[in-house]
Amino acid sequence: MISPSTKLYGLIGYPLGHSISFYIHNAAFRALSIDALYINIPIEPESFSKAILGIKYLPIYGLNVTIPHKERIIDFLDEISVISKLIGAVNTVYLEENKWKGENTDFGGFLETLKELKLDKDLPCLILGAGGAARAVVYAVIEYGFKEIYLTNRTYGRAERIAEEVKKNKNIEIKIIPWQERHKVDEKLILINTTSIGLDGKSTPWNGNFKSIAFVYDIIYNPKETPLLSLAKENNVPFKNGLDMLIYQACLSWNKWFGFIGPFEIMKREAEKLL
């Protein structure tokens, strides 16, 4: 129930039609009797600067940030966390001591799922993509303890930049594979898709051999089963979509907004109704 003292939280990005954040956060607010409302705030890229300056003066207590604004938001914040600096992206904004601060909970959300899956750290992982999500995933797999990491992207230079930054920040070598040669890796590995290929429910970033794949992780959560995951299923390869990562990053946002981690099971139940 909205009241005169209801606190506003929201999601900024463009477009926002695919997002279920509105539903999961509001379901959790209702379940825990928190007097708050989570709203979608679609901001077109060309209007971003003016819009974000306006938002900073409105009674909004916290934000999630999605594509294409995760990198641009940094310039408008007073402080960002160490991991946000490393990744170069922020997906959670919170107000503390009258300062707007930024955190990256995509990193923590993905890391939580890796811990649950207990994937073999001795297997190499091949990460598809080199956008903001890929950066969070790269640092999460390093934190988890994978010994060998391959990275491939349609734009070779973007993958190269991530590898250079990781070498500088963590002194860890990431091997870059040209996109057109990604299927040539023939050792047993874990495949992680961070690209948007599959969002349309028709395309897949991997048409190669599944015999060398030990596990497939697609961070897309809608559709629930992307063509990549359907292929994994057909080839009897265990797989996971991005829903738990989404829920965990949402729960970790609450830690910055309210001082406690959000209710995972409540949010997940709501998400599963929608997908």
Curated annotation (Swiss-Prot):
One of its GO terms (cellular component) is cytosol. This is Shikimate dehydrogenase (NADP(+)). Its EC number is 1.1.1.25. GO terms for biological process: amino acid biosynthetic process; aromatic amino acid family biosynthetic process; chorismate biosynthetic process; shikimate metabolic process. It comes from the Bacteria. It is an enzyme of class 1 (oxidoreductase). The active site is at K70 (proton acceptor). It catalyses: shikimate + NADP(+) = 3-dehydroshikimate + NADPH + H(+). The lineage of its organism: Bacteria, Pseudomonadati, Dictyoglomota, Dictyoglomia, Dictyoglomales. HAMAP family: Shikimate_DH_AroE. One of its GO terms (molecular function) is shikimate 3-dehydrogenase (NADP+) activity. NADP(+) binds at G129, A130, G131, G132, A133, N153, R154, T155, Y156, G157, R158, I219, G242. Belongs to the shikimate dehydrogenase family. InterPro entries: Aminoacid_DH-like_N_sf, NAD(P)-bd_dom_sf, SDH_C, Shikimate_DH, Shikimate_DH-bd_N, Shikimate_DH_fam, Shikm_DH/Glu-tRNA_Rdtase. Pathway: Metabolic intermediate biosynthesis; chorismate biosynthesis; chorismate from D-erythrose 4-phosphate and phosphoenolpyruvate: step 4/7. Keywords: Amino-acid biosynthesis, Aromatic amino acid biosynthesis, NADP, Oxidoreductase. Involved in the biosynthesis of the chorismate, which leads to the biosynthesis of aromatic amino acids. Catalyzes the reversible NADPH linked reduction of 3-dehydroshikimate (DHSA) to yield shikimate (SA). Disulfide bonds: none annotated. The gene is aroE.
